[in-house]
């Protein structure tokens, strides 16, 4: 995993909490994601911005990421377990791991292979539906490591 500068965090995530979430969701997180959260639960990064192609416009767009965490002392709005779909607006096999300042979601996309341990990273618009009435999903990176390589400080 490449070096990521963390501005602040909520301590270290507990391995048992990560494993319990994986079992409950029927997924396996990428190893580099696990390493990051085991070192920095709910990290806020010094360079949190990334660029992607907005499927609704075809234009490059910039968003930021604030990671959810696993700690029981975190507020519900910062806990990964409380951030998962509860109203049926998300596609199956999408696991949200972060949010953007505007309310969009950064997620692992397991739709191609629910058993993958290196899923794609996507951005899900919270206020823009696709043709099925689900939140529109935009591919950001083919893996978590590639996603980390896209992170930069906004100009």
What kind of region is each of these model predictions?
Residues 131-149, 153:
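Glycine-rich, aromatic-bearing surface loops/beta-hairpins
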Residues 63-66, 121, 140:
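N-terminal leader/targeting signatures
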Residues 1-104, 152-155:
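A surface-exposed partner-binding patch
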Residues 108-136:
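Segments surrounding the PLD/"HKD" phosphodiesterase catalytic module and close analogs
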Residues 31, 103, 108, 142-145:
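Intrinsically disordered, low-complexity segments enriched in small/polar residues
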